[in-house]
Swiss-Prot record:
Belongs to the frog skin active peptide (FSAP) family. Brevinin subfamily. This is Brevinin-1CDYd. One of its GO terms (biological process) is defense response to Gram-positive bacterium. It comes from the Eukaryota.
Length: 66
């Protein structure tokens, strides 16, 4: 139970950091844009796919069930 709480806390912490970094990046890009058509372009989130790709390995390591 403790390892589950610990891993969820780590995921929450990483998600919070990811969200704040993406928000800062999005704000910086919006300041640089001059063309109104470019404002509709979504900001690519690069950290989330990496986190999701490593999640099974992390869970396997934490719970020792592969």
């Amino acid at each position: 139970m403790f390892t589950l709480k610990k891993s969820l806390l780590i995921l929450f912490f990483l998600g919070t950091i990811n969200f704040s970094l993406c928000e800062e990046e999005r704000n910086a890009e919006e300041e640089r844009r001059d063309d109104p058509e470019e404002r509709d372009v979504e900001v690519e989130k690069r950290f989330l796919p990496l986190l999701l790709a490593g999640l099974p390995k992390l869970l396997c390591f934490l719970f020792k069930k592969c």
